[in-house]
C-alpha cells in the first residue's frame, strides 16, 4: 500500500491543483494530463505497479480494492473534471461521461502494460509513447472521419 501511495496516489493532489489553475483550453488540458501521466508514472519504474495489481487482483483483492480507491477512482474523477470542463465551455460535445472516462484512460493502461510486457521483447513493434499519446489525444478530440 505504501508503494502505491508513494509512487502514484500522492500525485493526485498536485494534479487537482494544476486542474484548478490551468489557463489553457480543455483540449490542451487533456493533452497535458495524458503527457504528464506518462512522464510522472508511465515512464518510471512505478509503471509496473498497475500491471502487478491487475495481474494479482484475484489473489490479493484487498490490494486491488486499495488501488481502485487510491488510484482508479481519483483518476476517473480527474478525467471527468477535464471532460466536463470542455463540455461546460462548449469545447466538447455532450457525451456519456461514465463511458468517456474509460476511452481516455484505457489506452494509457494499454501503453503501460505494453511497456512492461510485450514491449520488452518485440523490437519490431515498439511503440513510441509520446507519439502514441499525441495520436490518442488527436483521435479523441477529432475522430478519424473527414
Feature annotation, model-predicted:
Residues 5, 9, 13, 17, ...:
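Residue-level marker of structural boundaries
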Residues 14-19, 51-55, 68, 118-123:
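Short linear capping/connector segments at secondary-structure termini
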Residues 7-15, 45, 61, 79, ...:
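Short amphipathic alpha-helical interaction/hinge segments
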Residues 1-7, 64, 68:
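Amphipathic alpha-helical segments enriched in hydrophobic/aromatic and basic residues
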Residues 28, 39-48, 52-54, 62-88, ...:
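Amphipathic alpha-helical packing segments from all-alpha helical-bundle domains
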Residues 28, 32, 36, 73, ...:
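C-terminal peripheral helix-coil segments that are non-catalytic and often amphipathic
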Amino acid at each position: 500500500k505504501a508503494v502505491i501511495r508513494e509512487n502514484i496516489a500522492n500525485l493526485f493532489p498536485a494534479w487537482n491543483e494544476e486542474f484548478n489553475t490551468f489557463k489553457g483550453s480543455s483540449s490542451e488540458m487533456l493533452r497535458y494530463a495524458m503527457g504528464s501521466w506518462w512522464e510522472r508514472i508511465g515512464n518510471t519504474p512505478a509503471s509496473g505497479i498497475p500491471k502487478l495489481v491487475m495481474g494479482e487482483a484475484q489473489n490479493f483483492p484487498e490490494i486491488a480494492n486499495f488501488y481502485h480507491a487510491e488510484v482508479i477512482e481519483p483518476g476517473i474523477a480527474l478525467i471527468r473534471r477535464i471532460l466536463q470542463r470542455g463540455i461546460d465551455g462548449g469545447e466538447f460535445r455532450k457525451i456519456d461521461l461514465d463511458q468517456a472516462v474509460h476511452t481516455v484512460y484505457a489506452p494509457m493502461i494499454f501503453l503501460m502494460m505494453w511497456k512492461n510486457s510485450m514491449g520488452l521483447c518485440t523490437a519490431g513493434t515498439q511503440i513510441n509513447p509520446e507519439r502514441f499519446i499525441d495520436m490518442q489525444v488527436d483521435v479523441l478530440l477529432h475522430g478519424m472521419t473527414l
